[in-house]
């Protein structure tokens, strides 16, 4: 029986693809070598230890229906669209070796006519007249008996959108967590006009088979053709949850300030695991009572725009005469934390 396994996803759902990756990694025999090929529709994927409010323009992502997905590996934030090809190599130890998977990708690119080289810890670059340009970034995860290397290849990604979503608003965040390093990037279509996802997948597959001297049939997976993966439903539920994608952010503080016609407001939040652990308000409003009441309501709550807005509007019962102020405050807070 072959020790290789080849899976190709026809789903563009990042939560589905990352859940499949997680299940296969957890349950694969330690003797197996796996190649998983996939791609995501509009998504910002962040590293396991990153803060989405710090890394991403979360407001613009929500407006443009761009998903957030936290992966289980470390590293920085990346924007995925259908112009990216994603790959994952998995193997048991001691055979797991990220230099092997890197060489497979480099061999695939070479077969397509692109001369690339490894750079730093996790990038592949090509040399251009303007200098080195990144075409691939990777991240890694290891456990006691296995490891994986996953990454992306830029085929025809919309690089302008990359800048839109990975440049966060200038919020006053004093945050822990890993900050992404921005690199100069280029698309493979600049070097190979017309290159497709299918061609790149075929080249990586051939290089994978050539390295191990074996061939296997591809398993095509989708939400309708999920392979036999125990606990997949639970893994997908976790991967797609707010608690995982946002709530796992490292502790941070957020300062919001605004001046309204009725006074200036400064709100200080301390947030841990997506929950507000401390809320303070400072204001020169002639009627600060609603704001003081708000901080008490927010303590311990989720740091989510809809929840903050809900708590603001709940104060209308106790402070009906301040309806105008509370509605203005509600709209502002909801927009400021997205």
UniProtKB/Swiss-Prot annotation:
ATP binds at residues 71, 76-79, 134. This is Lipoate-protein ligase A. One of its GO terms (molecular function) is lipoate-protein ligase activity. It holds the Pfam family LplA-B_cat. Keywords: ATP-binding, Cytoplasm, Ligase, Nucleotide-binding. Monomer. SUPFAM superfamilies: Class II aaRS and biotin synthetases, SufE/NifU. It comes from Escherichia coli (strain 55989 / EAEC). (R)-lipoate binds at residue 134. Belongs to the LplA family. It is found in: Cytoplasm. In the transfer reaction, the free carboxyl group of lipoic acid is attached via an amide linkage to the epsilon-amino group of a specific lysine residue of lipoyl domains of lipoate-dependent enzymes. The gene is lplA. Residues 29-216 form the BPL/LPL catalytic domain. GO terms for biological process: protein modification process.
